[in-house]
């Protein structure tokens, strides 16, 4: 296969969000003390699931995107064939199921439900008032996918569920910003489109701020790392960085708000 279709296939997988969720999984595995092998396995499972969601999104929207001439969509523009994308989806789904169940049935079932939420979004919920629900469910369940994996399965602290859900809602609202006009032209009327640009920014930033406030509380729930002065210094630096990124979320253009989030 020549490099051009490979690059187009990677682009069709929505590499930004896919990499973000996969990286978050790896960070959660480290923060919750999962063994290295378990962390690698659950991260690979999440990567496979996210690839299937990204590719299915481009494939399902191909006809609609082609109608308005979206050259940034590899399937719609013909940069990669639908047949190749279908094959990639099949392989990624098979890998997702195998890797998920290898993490243990509790983690596996939870992760497959998470992937199902992503597919439900692609298949229709993205055009409804409830478009943020799959994101809330998926991001909210992600910590459990990690902590339930391996030989010592356990549920995460309750605040992680809520933090993940808020992060998912914020990510959805901010990720949709650059595509609001194109989506509206194809009849998509999800929550960000109903709120508009400013409303999505404000609500998205608010959701992320709420998630951050809960994340700060992880330290008291036993997820803290460094303690004393170094721990407090790290917390202050993290809050300062979050403030700067928050301004990018509210004032930025293009993909910058999502990247900052």
Ranges and model annotations:
Residues 1-261:
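Multi-pass alpha-helical membrane architecture of UbiA-family
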